[in-house]
Amino acid sequence: MKAKGNQKTKVNIVTLGCSKNLVDSENLLTQLRGNGIEAEHESKNDNSNVVVINTCGFIDNAKQESIDTILRYIDAKENGLIDKIYVSGCLSQRYKDDMEREMPQVDAFFGSNELPAILKKFRADYKHELVGERLLTTPSHYAYVKIAEGCDRPCSFCAIPVMRGKHVSTPMEDLVKQAKGMAAKGTKELILIAQDLTYYGLDIYKKRNLSDLLKNLSDVEGIDWIRLQYAYPSGFPLDVLDVMAERSNICKYIDMPLQHGSSDMLKLMRRGIDRPKTEDLIKTIRDKVPGIAFRTTMIIGHPGETEKDFDELCSFVEEQRFDRLGAFTYSHEEHTHSYSMEDTIPQEEKEERQATIMSIQEGISAELNEKKIGNTYKVLFDRKEGGYFIGRTEHDSPEVDNEVMVSAKDQYVRIGDFANVKINDAAEFDLFGEIVK
């Protein structure tokens, strides 16, 4: 990157954090190019002279990664390699005043929902007509669709409402327009994301309207899979399950972070649901949508978690046998309700408990995968790597779930295509198979 005072603006967008941040960066990329500005995402070239860093501020590790990235580009600026640095996203939303004071080399800081303000720095205007033209940074056959911004939930451990604000649903017509635009470019899978999918519509339609959104997206020609991520258990709209069972292009998959298996801990976490009601909901979901893959996450070591609470979490995971599960150690975050509670559990103990949960899940996953041997699944192939074509079934999200491996030695499939794969071997988190007609 070589800075020249009168050089034409060339922008590199750097994204940290979750898929919701990725969508924000894709929207910025689309708007910049739509205004005639040269822009790339995660550019490996050295010809950009302006960098926009879209930060994450969710937990300590994410905050540190964001800070390290900003400092790296500040060093580049001080060495004359770039002209301007703009910082956006959750970290600058949360700590804008502190960052302006500590990082004067950054030209401007923006919060999580300030796309028009960022564009003004480039003398560009927000063009609503580009809503259906979003440029993707993922492989073109799948795309994340953010159906809402912000969150109204009061979870004790989470600072998202501080960083992202109140829940705001995206109008259904805009989401359908996005889906049609993506389908026209060859996108086959839509992954619906939000801080809380199940709240969709309450603000603009005065009712939970996820089921109607699913129907409308399901009708878009060319979309083979629609996947739900980040559903909230309390107040889950059961009519979503009816649509999922009826529509063949809605994946039999749900990502529902449950966070714990102890009623006492769920109360401390302010989740609005206890263990018995959670168990009833899981049973209802599995009864209404046979064969559904249930993904969840758990938080380990929240203030107040006793050994008894942790034992209850272990028994909960063992009894429910989730198809996919992630476990994360509690991070003591400012601007959260639980920050006022003493973080008494040592990090080492949190990590030991986390390892115990993941060991339990590893055994469950191995048993569930073993039962898939001999079955044939429709697989969407994402990439070729290390002598294998690697794809996913409808029961798996990109990057976080199981993968299906097919040897590239004597078989071929085009990336982004579907193929039927017969499973002939299984590991804890991977399946191995061969393409069949």
UniProtKB/Swiss-Prot annotation:
Record note on cofactor: Binds 2 [4Fe-4S] clusters. One cluster is coordinated with 3 cysteines and an exchangeable S-adenosyl-L-methionine.
Residue ranges of domain Radical SAM core in the record: 137-367
Q: Which InterPro entries match?
A: Elp3/MiaA/NifB-like_rSAM, Methylthiotransferase, Methylthiotransferase_CS, Methylthiotransferase_N, Methylthiotransferase_N_sf, NA-bd_OB-fold, Ribosomal_uS12_MeSTrfase_RimO, rSAM
Which is one Gene Ontology cellular component term of this protein? cytosol
**Record keywords:** 4Fe-4S, Cytoplasm, Iron, Iron-sulfur, Metal-binding, S-adenosyl-L-methionine, Transferase
For whether the record's keyword set contains Iron-sulfur, the answer is yes
Q: Which cofactor does it need?
A: [4Fe-4S] cluster
Where it sits in the cell: the answer is: Cytoplasm
Q: Where does [4Fe-4S] cluster 1 bind?
A: 18, 56, 90
Top-rank taxon, per record:
Bacteria
- Which residues are [4Fe-4S] cluster 2-binding? 151, 155, 158
Q: Please list the GO terms describing molecular function.
A: 4 iron, 4 sulfur cluster binding; aspartic acid methylthiotransferase activity; metal ion binding; protein methylthiotransferase activity
Limits of the TRAM domain: 370-437
Q: MTTase N-terminal domain: which residues?
A: 9-124
The EC number of this protein is 2.8.4.4
As its record notes, the protein acts as a catalyst of: L-aspartate(89)-[ribosomal protein uS12]-hydrogen + (sulfur carrier)-SH + AH2 + 2 S-adenosyl-L-methionine = 3-methylsulfanyl-L-aspartate(89)-[ribosomal protein uS12]-hydrogen + (sulfur carrier)-H + 5'-deoxyadenosine + L-methionine + A + S-adenosyl-L-homocysteine + 2 H(+)
A Pfam family matched in the record? UPF0004
A GO BP entry is: tRNA modification
The UniProt family comment states: Belongs to the methylthiotransferase family. RimO subfamily.
The record describes the protein's role as: Catalyzes the methylthiolation of an aspartic acid residue of ribosomal protein uS12.
Record's NCBIfam families? 30S ribosomal protein S12 methylthiotransferase RimO (TIGR01125), MiaB/RimO family radical SAM methylthiotransferase (TIGR00089)
**What's the protein here called?**
Ribosomal protein uS12 methylthiotransferase RimO
- Specify the species: Cytophaga hutchinsonii (strain ATCC 33406 / DSM 1761 / CIP 103989 / NBRC 15051 / NCIMB 9469 / D465)
The record lists the lineage as:
Bacteria, Pseudomonadati, Bacteroidota, Cytophagia, Cytophagales
